[in-house]
Swiss-Prot record:
Protein name: Chaperone protein DnaK
Biased composition (Basic and acidic residues): 614-624
Segments of this protein annotated with the region Disordered: 593-642
Family: Belongs to the heat shock protein 70 family.
Species per Swiss-Prot/TrEMBL record: Chlorobium phaeobacteroides (strain BS1)
PROSITE patterns recorded: HSP70_1 (PS00297), HSP70_2 (PS00329), HSP70_3 (PS01036)
Gene field: dnaK
Length: 642
């Protein structure tokens, strides 16, 4: 049985881990980083870049660089008005669903997420040296059914069988509590990531991880803090220069990067200077942005965001039926928990200093890997009892939502209830499935609708319709309705907004495979071109060094073959490069044989380097994303993005 990897599919960054024996291991990507930016870019020549390669070119290719796609997952177009405003890429409405438009193509959020998942899958395969087909993927605890389905679809498109969808705070608790299985602890996991906020209260003991309650906000995260700084910088520049930088996509992307950097710096410093030279230009000349931002100003700008963290925490504590004093630890998860004001707020809310023993960027992926180990049998004596974050029910007479499964019910769970008709001789009923906490159906999230027909005519209230809700361990809902008189039953697996049908998923899977093949072909072409480049260089060098020692006829042959290879190299045609390289290498072999037989005693030339190992020869290094980095010398190996 192959390994089940754990993937934290984040709004800003993603991370992949796997169990190695009894220990979880976070896997470095091809660039040497333990987390990968959740970014996808499409270049002018049709190349697709994922992760750091996409991030590096985001400023100059803002309209074709997609980030924070997680915020669009499983949501209708009319639900994403705020997110759409701040995205430099184009988000369009296709039959009520949100789609990203790049050139003449549109992509669903699931497809973009699948590209990120493919990168994580490839990272794991490179590390393990074997194919990976199964994964545990994490989602925010407060994700609804549609968002969970969309995440599962993304996994399918990426070629992964999603063995389990697991809540991020629950995954973090697995990582935190794996070594404390014999202690009875009540733990709050405070998870503030790039795009979402979750708070979960759990009880850990004897290998059982039981979620008591969960709450959160799927529209609150690091992106929102960045946006506050972006708006502040844009407003300041507009006051000074009369130019709104928000109308310039390239300038806006530079503001975004500067805002993120400033936010990070203000976690360890009380002030920072934001200096963006040549941010724009007018007839008078170039304009520069220089603004000093203090930590206190940042906290004032984001005061409403900090306030928004309080209510979910209070609700989660109340629903857990625990007192704040009974909670033993508060574990911080997500990069945004590094903000000092957030840490102070947590300490004030829970009356204790937060626990910083886990890596907030990696702990969720580690927990997902542990759950993968549980499912594959590599990890024993661990039982995970999660909950559904929101109540589930149906619309009944008068437009009221009648709850069948309450929020914070342990999953998997099944509940049945008997309903009847609202009118005389009614022969069919519509089951309108809802998720949320509001009393009126119209104020809650519609998950789906289906009909049960052929009900025998009878007076109102006589037919007995049994509605059953079955929520699985992924938090995904299945609903059935049965006429108890006839035994006729209708059931559905909820297919809500953003849910792709099987045909769409299969098509996207094929597209993903095609892209993977294209990426591999492009990589092979780059490797071959680099090898040709190395052969041209070494041939010219050796011809110069050997001079007249090479027989005249052989020298002519070498020069002719060299010119042929140069022409092929310029054309970038793989079909002509390979034969030209083979011809030149064959002539070099003849030259070496001839010179071995010369009486002069000179050392014959070695066969020129063909670029088979570019790194050792100073050739170009090709990254997994198909991007070629220029030759460079590392000055400070520690200078990495955090």
């Amino acid at each position: 049985m192959g390994k089940i990897i754990g993937i934290d599919l984040g709004t800003t960054n993603s991370c992949v881990a796997v169990m190695q024996g009894t220990k979880p291991t976070v896997i470095e990507n091809s660039e040497g980083y333990r987390t990968t930016p959740s970014m996808v870019a499409f270049t002018k020549n049709g190349e697709r870049l994922v992760g750091h390669a996409a991030k590096r070119q985001a400023i100059t290719n803002a309209e074709n660089t997609i980030f924070s796609i997680k915020r669009f997952m499983g949501r209708k177009f009319d639900e994403i008005s705020n997110e759409k405003k701040i995205a430099p890429y184009k988000v369009t409405n296709v039959n009520g669903e949100a789609r990203v438009e790049i050139g003449d193509k549109t992509y669903s959020p699931q497809e973009i997420s699948a590209m990120i998942l493919q990168k994580m899958k490839q990272t794991a395969e490179d590390f393990l040296g074997e194919k990976v087909t199964e994964a545990v993927i994490t989602v925010p605890a407060y994700f609804n059914d549609a968002q969970r389905q969309a995440t599962k679809d993304a996994g399918k498109i990426a070629g992964l069988e999603v063995k389990r969808i697991i809540n991020e705070p629950t995954a973090a608790s697995l990582s935190y509590g794996l070594d404390t299985k014999n202690e009875n602890e009540k733990v709050a996991v405070f998870d503030l990531g790039g795009g979402t906020f979750d708070i979960s209260i759990l009880e850990l003991g004897d290998g059982v991880f039981e979620v008591k309650s969960t709450d959160g906000d799927t529209h609150l995260g690091g992106d929102d803090f960045d946006q506050k700084i972006i708006d502040f910088l844009a407003d300041e520049f507009k006051k000074q220069e009369g130019i709104d930088l928000r109308n310039d996509m390239m300038a806006l992307q530079r503001l975004k990067e500067a805002a993120e950097k400033a936010k990070v710096e203000l976690s360890s410093r009380t002030d920072t200077e934001i200096n963006l030279p040549f941010i724009t230009a007018t007839q008078e000349g170039p304009k520069h942005l220089v603004v000093n931002l203090t930590r206190s100003k940042f906290e004032a700008l984001c005061s409403d965001l900090f306030d928004s963290l309080i209510a979910p925490c209070k609700r989660a504590i109340k629903n857990s039926k625990l007192k704040t004093s009974e909670i033993n630890e508060v574990v911080l998860v997500g990069g945004s928990t590094r903000i000092p004001k957030v840490q102070a707020l947590v300490e004030e809310l829970f009356g204790r200093e937060p626990n910083r023993s886990v890596n907030p960027d990696e702990v969720v992926a580690v927990g997902a890997a542990i759950q993968g180990g549980v499912l594959s049998g590599d990890v024993s004596d661990v039982l995970l009892l999660d909950v559904t974050p929101l109540s589930l029910g149906i619309e009944t007479l008068g437009g009221v939502m009648t709850k069948l499964i309450e929020a914070n019910t342990t999953i998997p769970s099944k509940k049945q209830e008997v309903f009847s008709t609202a009118a005389d001789n009614q022969t069919s009923v519509e089951v309108h499935v809802l998720q949320g906490e509001r009393p009126m159906a119209s104020d809650n999230k519609t998950l789906g609708r289906f009909h049960l027909g052929d009900i025998p005519p009878a007076p109102r209230g006589v037919p007995q319709i049994e509605v059953a809700f079955d929520i699985d361990s992924n938090g995904i809902l299945h609903v059935s309705a049965k006429d108890k008189a006839t035994g006729k039953e209708q059931s559905i697996r909820i297919e809500a907004s953003g849910k792709l049908n099987d045909a769409e998923i299969e098509k996207m899977k094929e597209d993903a495979k095609t892209h993977a093949a294209e990426d591999e072909k492009r990589k092979e072409a780059i490797d071959l071109k680099n090898s040709a480049d190395a052969l041209i260089f070494s041939t010219e060098k050796q011809l110069g060094e050997l001079g007249d020692k090479v027989p005249a006829d052989k020298k002519t042959q070498l020069e002719e073959a060299l010119e042929k290879l140069k022409e092929a190299h310029k054309s970038e045609n793989v079909e002509t490069i390979k034969p030209a390289m083979d011809e030149l290498n064959t002539i070099w072999n003849d030259v070496a044989s001839t010179m071995y037989q010369t009486p002069s005693g000179d050392t014959p030339p070695s066969e020129p380097e063909t670029g088979a190992s570019e790194e050792s020869k100073g050739g170009d290094k090709t990254q997994g994303d198909g991007e070629v980095d220029a030759e460079y010398e590392v000055i400070d190996g520690n200078d990495k993005d955090k």
